[in-house]
C-alpha cells in the first residue's frame, strides 16, 4: 500500500485543488420556442438552433 514519505502542507494541498472548481452552465434562450436550455444542447422540445430535430415524445400511460 502506498504511504506518503512526507506530509503535504495546506498550501500544496490547496494549490493542487485550485483547478477543481465547478463552473455554471451557460444558458441561452431558444429563438423558436423561447425555452431556456444549455448552449449547444437540444431543448426538451427537440429544437436545436431554431430547427426541430425530433418530435417530442408522447406521455406514457
Swiss-Prot record:
Keywords: Ribonucleoprotein, Ribosomal protein. Residues 1-44 are annotated as: Disordered. Residues 7-16 have a biased composition (Basic residues). InterPro entries: Ribosomal_bL32, Ribosomal_bL32_bact, Ribosomal_zn-bd. GO terms for molecular function: structural constituent of ribosome. Residues 25-34 have a biased composition (Polar residues). Belongs to the bacterial ribosomal protein bL32 family. This is Large ribosomal subunit protein bL32. It comes from Acinetobacter baumannii (strain AB0057).
